[in-house]
Amino acid sequence: IGLNFIEDKEYATLSLRPELFFTDKDMPKEQRQEVSRQYFSKLWNKKYDETLKEWESIIFKSNHLKFCIPKGNERFQFQISNNSSLSLLLGKDHDPAIIIPQQLSNRILFRGGIIPEPLLCFPSINAERDNFDWNQMRGLVRNKPTDYWKDEKFSIGVSLSVIAPIEKSGRFASFISNLSRNLSPVKKDHDYLVDYPGFNSAYHTQLFIPSPGTDKWQYSKLYYTSAYEIASDITLKINRLAINGQSVILIFIPKEWEKFKTLNHKGEKIDLHNYIKAYCASRGITTQLIEEKTLTDIMLCEKIWWLSLAIYVKSLRTPWTLASLDENTAYAGIGYSILSKVDNEQHVVMGCSHIYNRFGEGLKYKLQKVNNPIFDRKNNPYMSYEEAYKFGTMIQNLFLESMDKLPTRVVIHKRTHFRNDEINGIKDSLKAAGIETVELLTIEFECERKELPYDINRYGVGIHNYPIKRGAYIVISDNTFLLWTHGVVPSIRNESLSYYPGGIGIPAPLKITRYSGSSTVQTIATEILGFTKMNWNSFNLYTKLPATIDTSNTLAQVSHLLRHKSEQTFDYRLFI
């Protein structure tokens, strides 16, 4: 149950979220979670609406419930009505001839709209102009990647190196050879996947794949006695491969290593994957870890598309850019890594920032040790005024390094609220540099709220079969709105058809809260929606969180291993 207060209204809304109750108290937690997952993944609009109506009939014997506090005191009372609130969303293609029935119109408390799917920018085949597409794969196949010119000018291509056990090398070599082949998706994936034309055709550059037994194919052992032994041997082989020149190193992880996912390093328990990433990032080496369970023919076209993108990006190339962002705006995401106490030392918090502009430049990641952090009851860290001021200065420097000028506007995203010290410190720092326009935004999931779209047309009213559209937004107050980054999108095979990626349950929106700034809701929503298409570690049509937040939090998990390099600036592609 959730209670939501509405600005300038004498009433609030009550949200009911169905949950499963297990009578068997001895049922294992993992089993309960799996049963719940399967149940809610199939609880779509109409079934959800029916479930709510069943509970309404149980809770409300009449039109409303009346309560007195204390009981019997009529002077202080409140009541709960069984009328659900509605939101009116007007898209650019809405039909003005459709009249909303009065019984629905009276229940409209919120209004909003729908942001179109953001377009991505690709150089045309003849490179005479830029073309635009909302589907990353189709855009690449029909055009060229942003950094095509590097290969046309220097003819350098993309080189791979491999670390794999000799016993598994034949199978792994067969799998990565698919990178050079034409592949077609299975029928059920036709709504968002296109044919894979081979690496050279997709990215307009040559891919050099080594063979087992060559100097660019190092053999690891199949069996180790500890995670530490794996890490030591892998890093040794990484150093050998790095001597042979720049390449993307593929590291095969066999199932025999499953039990060694963490290692003890200087008293800390560290994820093996993160340890390898941090080791390589500190040396400017890009890697791609591939687990043995990936080497199946199931969804092969999808896997090879994903792997090809990872390789292209980790060769420090840019595949696409956003078409809708202001080139004079700097975008930063804040993530944190908190170290538990080690050898009686205090917690250490590392802050990180992520800078973007529409051209794909300035993709920098810098570590900043946060001195004297302030923790809330949930152990979330916050910056003091002094640390926030330093953070603002760091943004200026990162942008200057990439663009040779200062931005006129700065937008900062993070998952937790901004304290007054953080607001004042960041704004004062940027203002001192002449930057007056500063947007401070908190982005978090709003799981309490479910929106069930109504089908309103000339034939009547009913619950829609499909979830809410991606890009829908609802204004809650002057500084708060909801944005659906996950939802229905057009099908790539026929854009008049609807496609719901994953097809699971009812999508939850993001709750956006503004602590500084004056941009319109449409501007902020368009920027956030665009950044959900900028995670270059995936060919998913989008991620639920914008890349400013999604990548910053992921990178923060690796960054604490590099805390001794807190003044160094990294290309973020070293971490993905």
Q: What positions do the PLM features span?
A:
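Extended, highly charged clamp/arch subdomains and adjacent linkers
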Residues: I1-Q288, P373-P381, T569-I576
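Long, contiguous domain-sized segments
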Residues: I1-E30, D195, F199-P212, Q218-A227, ...
